[in-house]
Amino acid sequence: MKVHMLKSKIHNAIVTSGDLEYEGSITIDKELLEIADMMANEKVLVVNNNNGERFETYIIEGTRGLREIQLNGAAARCALPGDEIIIMAFAEMEPEEARNWQPMIVIVDRMNNPKRRHRVGKDNEYLG
């Protein structure tokens, strides 16, 4: 039996734009994806801290350095530009591996610049 564990989280990201006409997804700056150990097409759970909305979508890789967090398609109705969100990716693993698993947490500022990251239970690595 496998369990679903938090793999990575981008905490307190700010939605920069939305595109209702796009087919769906969330566009995330490539650098943030690398720092958070996330990748294009990966399924994510997004939580809107402003209204409590929770939704699943998949990642599209954005341009490095633009600090873009864009919601596309129906997801654009779940959060507005300026809303604070949490983006979480999960992984399946055996219970033995899960017991020692430490997810990657990335904290960003109000401009989506990465400020620090750490694995749960480990020291912070300050960025920028």
UniProtKB/Swiss-Prot annotation:
Q: Which residues carry this modification: Pyruvic acid (Ser)?
A: 25
- What is the annotated localization of this protein? Cytoplasm
Keywords of the record, alphabetical order, are: Autocatalytic cleavage, Cytoplasm, Decarboxylase, Lyase, Pantothenate biosynthesis, Pyruvate, Schiff base, Zymogen
Q: Which residues bind substrate per the record?
A: 57, 73-75
Broad EC category: lyase
What CDD domains does this protein's entry cite?
Asp_decarbox
Cellular component terms per the entry's GO annotation: cytosol
Keyword hit for Cytoplasm: yes
Cofactor binding, note field: Binds 1 pyruvoyl group covalently per subunit.
According to its UniProt record, which residues of this chain constitute the active site? Answer: 25, 58
- Coiled coil residues, start to end: none
Record-listed E.C. numbers: 4.1.1.11
Is Ribosomal protein one of the keywords UniProt gives this record?
A: no
Q: Which InterPro entries match?
A: Asp_de-COase-like_dom_sf, Asp_decarbox
Which reaction does this chain catalyze?
L-aspartate + H(+) = beta-alanine + CO2
What Gene Ontology terms describe what this protein does at the molecular function level?
aspartate 1-decarboxylase activity
Record note on quaternary structure = Heterooctamer of four alpha and four beta subunits.
Reported function: Catalyzes the pyruvoyl-dependent decarboxylation of aspartate to produce beta-alanine.
Name-wise, this protein is: Aspartate 1-decarboxylase
- What is the species listed in this Swiss-Prot or TrEMBL entry? Chlorobaculum parvum (strain DSM 263 / NCIMB 8327)
> What lineage is this protein's organism placed in?
Bacteria, Pseudomonadati, Chlorobiota, Chlorobiia, Chlorobiales
